Amino acid sequence: MWRVASGLHLRLFEMDTDITGLARMRLGEHAIHTWDVAVALDPSATVAPDAVGLLIDTVGQLATWAGKPDGRERRIRVSVRDPERNFVLTTGEAVGLTESDGEESLPELRLSAEAFIRLVYGRLGRQHTPPVEADGVDLDELRQLFPGL
């Protein structure tokens, strides 16, 4: 059996990560590609809930890396459920996603955590979109910001 040296850091895809981060990236790939196969057979398929529970807390780093800015300045509250989290999505010259305390009044997107993860991975096409609530937000514009990995 081998042992990983503590403090091991890797530079992947212009991001610094450790072994835990690498495992989380692989989990995300596995969960999304499993969904890719499942949805071909069952249009109502979803990403595994246990994977969603782990991935939602690191979706900000992925959004920053995967987002393709269009130059349009936006600040959007993203409220997700199952599990419940609140973020602020910013766009302009870059795409950013940070945790939010929910205090300021912003245009808002409300959807499941599973659907939001698929949006960031570029997998929230119209044919596979569960119910969402968008107040002052154009979901099609957000789809263009996250064209897929």
PLM regions: where:
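Short intrinsically disordered, low-complexity coil segments enriched in acidic
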Residues: 1-6, 10, 139-144
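Short, contiguous alpha-helical
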Residues: 13-67, 116
